[in-house]
Amino acid sequence: RDRLSVTRLNDGRLKIKFTDQLLDEVIAESLRHISRKHDAYKIQVECEELILAHMDVRLIIQVLVNLIDNAIKYTPQGSTICIRGLRTDGRAQISVEDNGPGIADEMKSHIFEMFYTGKTTIADSHRSLGLGLALCHSIIEAHEGELTLKDNYPHGCIFVFTLPLSEVTLNE
């Protein structure tokens, strides 16, 4: 299913339905989709209020669920996973931070490629990301945003993506 989605996104056949959404509500909805999985983790959400972003909410929830699922999959139970939402440089910025083993430097340039799993042997504990990150990358690009990976020192990953802010302003 992911491969079909990536193909349809990349060749323009997947119709994107843009609406203006409050970022904190989209993050909360994403967490409802993974609620059964994250009981053994502390999920911390830090989101500035009233960030209205222009997005296809269904696709952005898919991106968030994928990034949070990866963080859960590769982080020891009992760990904290932090999701942040903020305004920066005229964009909405969302990050998912974990303190798992991280991703080796030599793999970082490949993680958004389709079918790249980051495994060299079956015994490796490296992340097996397959289509998920390629799909996330395509979705964010279709939103004229950017998906990047940073190191979370001393270990772990921070996946950061940006979305356009809504042109509508909310009266606070």
Predicted features along the sequence, with ranges:
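Conserved catalytic submotifs in the C-terminal HATPase_c
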Residues: K17-L22, K42-L52
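Short helix-loop "hinge" at the ATP-lid/N-box region of the Bergerat-fold HATPase_c
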Residues: A71-I72
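Helix-loop junction within the histidine kinase core
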Residues: T7-F18
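Glycine-rich ATP-lid/hinge loop adjacent to the conserved G-boxes
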Residues: Y116-R127
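Short alpha-helical Gxxx[C/S/T] motif in the catalytic ATP-binding
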Residues: G132, C136
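Short conserved segment of the HATPase_c
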Residues: I103-F115
